[in-house]
Amino acid sequence: MAWTPLWLTLLTLCIGSVVSSELTQDPAVSVALGQTVRITCQGDSLRSYYASWYQQKPGQAPVLVIYGKNNRPSGIPDRFSGSSSGNTASLTITGAQAEDEADYYCNSRDSS
């Protein structure tokens, strides 16, 4: 039986930050099941504020997956991680799973 990779589409969209400056994200990306994907978000506000990352599946409310420097809410798998440098924040999914197929949004939040 031949192995067929499952392709996941991780979509990113732009939203405004809490400080009313624009953030821009990657276009849609695809990743094979089990591989690592990184989604980036850029904006001047990210020099002063951390990014929050949200996952949204069709017909469902957004779910916070990363906030602050690199914090995960309870129940979020450790394959999700966040990082930042300068005006760029990144969400990394290490070993993507089928259930990770979703839209991912970034937003900036206060660094305190």
Swiss-Prot record:
Signal peptide annotation: 1-20
GO terms for MF: antigen binding
Region ranges (Disordered): 75-95
SUPFAM superfamilies per the UniProt record, alphabetical: Immunoglobulin
Cystine connections: 41-106
Highest taxon, organism lineage: Eukaryota
Free-text function comment from the UniProt entry: V region of the variable domain of immunoglobulin light chains that participates in the antigen recognition. Immunoglobulins, also known as antibodies, are membrane-bound or secreted glycoproteins produced by B lymphocytes. In the recognition phase of humoral immunity, the membrane-bound immunoglobulins serve as receptors which, upon binding of a specific antigen, trigger the clonal expansion and differentiation of B lymphocytes into immunoglobulins-secreting plasma cells.
Protein name (Swiss-Prot/TrEMBL): Immunoglobulin lambda variable 3-19
Organism of this sequence: Homo sapiens
